[in-house]
Amino acid sequence: MLSRFIKRTYSTQTSSPVVGIIGSGPAAFYTAHRLLRNDPNVKIDMFESRPVPFGLVRYGVAPDHPEVKHVEHKFSEIAESTQFRFLGNVNVGTDVSLRDLTKNYDCLVLAYGAAGDKRLGIPGEDLSGVYSAREVVGWYNSDPRNQNLELDLSQVEDAVVIGHGNVSLDVARILLSNPAQLSPTDINPLFLKSLERSNLKRLHIVGRRNIFSVSFTIKELRELFALSSAVFFAPSFNYSTKWMNETDASGLDRPRKRLLKLLVSEIQKAVSEKRVAPYSKDKKCWNLEFGLTPVEILGHKGNVENVRFQITDSIRTDAESKFTTIPAQLFIRSIGYKSMPLPGMKDVGVPFDDAKGIVKNVNGFVRPGIYTSGWVKHGPIGVIATTMMDAFATADTITKDWKSKKEFLKNSKLGWDGLKKNIKTPVIHWKDWKVIRNAEIERGLRHESLSEKFRSNEDMIKLIYPGKK
C-alpha cells in the first residue's frame, strides 16, 4: 500500500520542482535560499504555525544580542522573491494535513525545529518555580506560547540553572543584567518590570559533568564575567590546580584550552579576593558548579525551596560527601530542546525517532520526495552558521536528486493554489508580516526601544484581519 502511495511517474520532472517547506526558522530559510540559488525557477511555499517568521531567531536569540538577528535581513531578501510564498498561522497536521501537502508538492522539507523540552525525570520537577530554559527565553522574548509564566522574581533570592550550554549562560546573563541596559532592546516589557523588582542575590549555573565537557563558548562566558551588575564567586573548594594539570588539558583543542584558562584565572582571582560561596554583597552574584547531578527538587507548600545533588566529579574537594544541597526559589533546566512529530507523519511514510527526537533520515533524505533540515534532522545542536551549512547540504541533495530524475511525490504541482480553498484559518502572508513588524517598531518607539513585539497571536491576527473573531 505504502509503495503505491509514494510511487510517481517522471513525466512532470522536465520543469523545476514545487517545494513545500515546513517551518520558517534558519534551517527553513537557508534551505530555501540554496534551492533558489541552485535553480531560480523552483517554487517555494513556506508553512509556519505562528503568524510570524524566523523561529528561534525571533524567539530564541537573547535580546542583548541584536547582531545575531541581522540574519533576518537576509531571510527577508529571500522572501521577496517572486518564487517564494510565506504562509503564516498555518499548522501543518491540523490546518492542513501532511497527506494533502504530498498531493500538491513535488517535494516537502521538514524544517520545523524543536519546540519541546528534555526533562530531568527527577522528583519535584513539577513544583512551582521550576521552568525550562525555553519557557524563560520565550517569556523575555515575548513568545506568545510563554506569556503565562507565574514567575515573580521579587520572591527569588537563590536560583539554579542546570546545564552548561550557551542557552544556560544567556538565561543567567539576562537574569543578572541591569534592567536599564536591557530597556533599549526588544525585550518583553513585562519581563523587564519583573526584573526591576528582582531580589535575586545568588545564581548557580550547574553542570552534571566536569569542566572539560562544557558546551558554552568563550564569548558567552566573557559576557558573564563582564557584567557590571553582577560579580562572580568561586565555590568553597578549589579546582584550579587540577584543572591546570597538563595531562588533563593535553587532549583539548585550542578554543577549549583558552576557555579553561579564562575560567581558572577568574576562579583563582575570586579565591584570592575571598569571593567564595556563599559570597554576597550589594551586587547579584553567580558561579559555575561542575560534577553535580540533580537527584531531587525539594519544595515547601508546592514551591521549590532546595535542590539536592549527587556529587559525581572526584576533582571536587567535597566529593567524599556524596550529596550536597543548594537553596533555590527558582530552578531552570537547560538540558536541551526536543523536536516532536507532526500529526500524520506515519500516514505519509515519515519515520520519527522518539528517543532521539528527530525524523529518521540519511543526510537529509527521508523517503522519495520528503527531506529534512535543521534540528529536526540531527537534533538541537549547533549555531546559526552550522545550521546554514546543514541546510545547504539538504538543499543540494534535493537539487541533485531532482536532476537525476529520482523518485519524488506524485502530485498536482499546484502547491498552495491546490490547498487554499480548504484552509479555514486566517493566513498571514509576507506583506502582512511586514505590517506586523512595522507596528512592533512603532510600539517600541513609545518606550525608546528597538521594538515591542506582540505577545499574543490573536493581536497579530486582529491587526491584519480586524473583523475576524
Swiss-Prot record:
Chemical reaction(s) catalysed: 2 reduced [adrenodoxin] + NADP(+) + H(+) = 2 oxidized [adrenodoxin] + NADPH
Top EC class, one word: oxidoreductase
EC number: 1.18.1.6
One GO term of the biological process aspect: [2Fe-2S] cluster assembly
Chain positions recorded as NADP(+) binding sites: 164-167, 208-209, 220, 382
GO cellular-component term (any): mitochondrial [2Fe-2S] assembly complex
Coiled-coil residue windows: none
Residues annotated for FAD binding in this entry: 27, 48, 56, 92, 375, 382-384
Protein localization: Mitochondrion inner membrane
Source taxon at top rank: Eukaryota
Membrane-related topology note: Peripheral membrane protein
Keyword terms: Electron transport, FAD, Flavoprotein, Membrane, Mitochondrion, Mitochondrion inner membrane, NADP, Oxidoreductase, Transit peptide, Transport
Transit peptide extent on chain: 1-38
Cofactor(s) this protein cannot do without: FAD
Example of a GO MF term: ferredoxin-NADP+ reductase activity
Record's keyword annotation contains Transit peptide: yes
InterPro entries in the record: FAD/NAD-bd_sf (IPR036188), FAD/NAD-binding_dom (IPR023753), Ferredox_Rdtase (IPR055275), Ferredox_Rdtase_adrenod (IPR021163)
Function: Adrenodoxin reductase transfers electrons from NADPH to adrenodoxin, which is involved in heme A biosynthesis and in iron-sulfur cluster assembly. Involved in the electron transfer to heme A synthase etp1(cd), a heme protein that catalyzes the conversion of heme O to heme A. Required for the de novo synthesis of Fe-S clusters on iron sulfur cluster assembly protein isu1. Involved in electron delivery for Fe-S cluster synthesis. Essential for coenzyme Q biosynthesis. May be involved in the electron transfer required for the hydroxylation reaction performed by coq6.
Family to which this protein belongs: Belongs to the ferredoxin--NADP reductase type 1 family.
Name the record gives this protein: Probable NADPH:adrenodoxin oxidoreductase, mitochondrial
Organism listed in the record: Schizosaccharomyces pombe (strain 972 / ATCC 24843)
Biological classification of the source: Eukaryota, Fungi, Dikarya, Ascomycota, Taphrinomycotina
Gene for this chain: arh1
